[in-house]
Swiss-Prot record:
Species of provenance: Sinorhizobium fredii (strain NBRC 101917 / NGR234)
Name of protein: Uncharacterized protein y4oC
Swiss-Prot/TrEMBL keywords: Plasmid
Superkingdom of source: Bacteria
Amino acid sequence: MDEVAIKDEFYRLIPSRFPPVAVYEGLVSEDKIEALVEIENKTNPRLQSEGRLLSAHTDPRAPRLQNWNLAPFKYLNPEGIRFFDGSRPALELADDRQTALAMSVERRQAFLSRTKEAPIGLDMRLLKTPVSGRFIDFRKYPIDLSCEERWRLGGSVPEGADGVIYHPPERPSAICIAVLRGDVLGRTIQTVHYRYVWNGTRISLLYAFDDAGNEIRPEVLGGADDAFAV
């Protein structure tokens, strides 16, 4: 399988409800925090993995132990992702924020449609992660492959591979990677926050909580043109 060396920054969006601080901070009295943390350490799969990595003499400051980097490999998506079913841990990242938004909006919209959600505003945060590794090149495969064909290709990726690189259907001109090994991730930082406006039928508008305060029409995100160009 052809491989591509990658050393760049990649993007994804997560709901803003996932806190960047300790979950119990400010919610319970100090004398109860220790007991709550002990319970969580025994039941939380992400923290169990973190404990195993630390016991193997991993630096506690290592990027792979950062919550945003470790959680995707412990809380699997039961629906799978583009080239991997729900049994193989993987993290999808986009090569720029427009592509990350296009992918995120499409998937949030599909979920909200299935659940028949009433009109609502969804707050999301954009994360940026450095990546350095060698990725199997799937860009030669057509966008319209069936799910069965795509997962069969993913199943051919050997254990120990860093991941795969491909064109996402949400924005075919762009690049997406599926990371299979957390070791290739650098330290993630949060950047811009967005609000997705769900009107009960579709996501009709995005607001950026940045200095420019831009409004973004979701339908322009999937095109080759830069949706953020002035």
